[in-house]
A protein has these predicted regions:
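Polybasic low-complexity intrinsically disordered regions
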Residues: 1-115, 128-130, 185
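Tryptophan-centered motif/residue detector
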Residues: 22, 58-59, 151, 159, ...
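Helix-centric, low-specificity signal for extended rod-like, repetitive segments
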Residues: 18, 41, 141-143, 148, ...
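Catalytic-loop motifs flanking and including active-site residues across diverse enzymes
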Residues: 70-73, 152, 179-182
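Charged phosphate-binding loop/patch that engages nucleotide di/tri-phosphates or the phosphate backbone
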Residues: 180-196
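Helix-centered, glycine/charged polyanion-binding patches within enzymatic domains
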Residues: 86-175
Length: 196
């Protein structure tokens, strides 16, 4: 118990944030403002954008219509929380933002520099390496292979799916959907604290 508590201590400024998005279907109760169609996932609903630390707990959360691209959703999320990056001193290491291949670092950099010109002195984008077929064969693996560090955010997505109220989007507004997402993680973190 003590070891786990010690390991969980985090520094004030993180050095790694993992990003992912998840398309979720709407129910008939969902409002018009939260309806969009994601052609890639063939989902009519919303998209949850999540930024987590190395323990899988959220740094930032944001919900958009499902037809919003991953890049645009991430830009909106980071813009909403730009004060975190403004307050970060220049003398601490850059934050690595690890994204998958659905994101385009050049597009993200150009958009964020318009909002906060000094941001790229404080963060850097990195796409997680996807193992090639030759690498899989060399390791004797086939099909789905866990990508280093990416499993953390995939686990966070599965934590969300364990909340019954998040299986589908029932909320009338995107703000309510984001709040429901935050409540899910607050509940999870409180349970962890209670067991220490």
């Amino acid at each position: 118990m003590a070891k786990r508590g010690y390991r969980s201590k985090k520094k004030q400024w993180t050095t790694l944030i993992l990003i992912d998005s998840q398309a979720v279907k709407n129910t008939c109760n969902a409002g018009v403002d939260s309806k969009g169609f994601c052609a890639y996932k063939s989902t009519n609903g919303i998209k949850r954008h999540l930024a987590v630390d190395t323990l899988g707990f959220p740094f930032f959360t944001h919900c958009t219509k499902a037809n919003i691209s991953d890049d645009r959703g991430l830009i909106e999320m980071l813009t909403k929380h730009i004060d975190y990056f403004r307050g970060k001193p220049m003398n601490v290491p850059k934050i690595t933002i690890l994204v998958d291949h659905g994101y385009h670092p050049k597009t993200l950099t150009a958009a964020l520099e318009k909002i906060y010109p000094a941001i790229m002195h404080k963060i850097r984008f990195e796409q997680s390496a996807k193992p090639s077929r030759a690498e899989k064969d060399a390791q004797g693996k086939s099909g789905f292979v866990v990508v280093k560090a990416r499993w953390v955010i995939e686990r966070s997505n599965s934590w969300m799916e364990r909340c019954k109220s998040l299986m589908k989007n029932c909320e009338r507004t995107l703000d309510h959907a984001t709040t429901k997402l935050n409540l899910c993680f607050i509940r999870l973190m409180l349970k962890r604290l209670a067991h220490k």
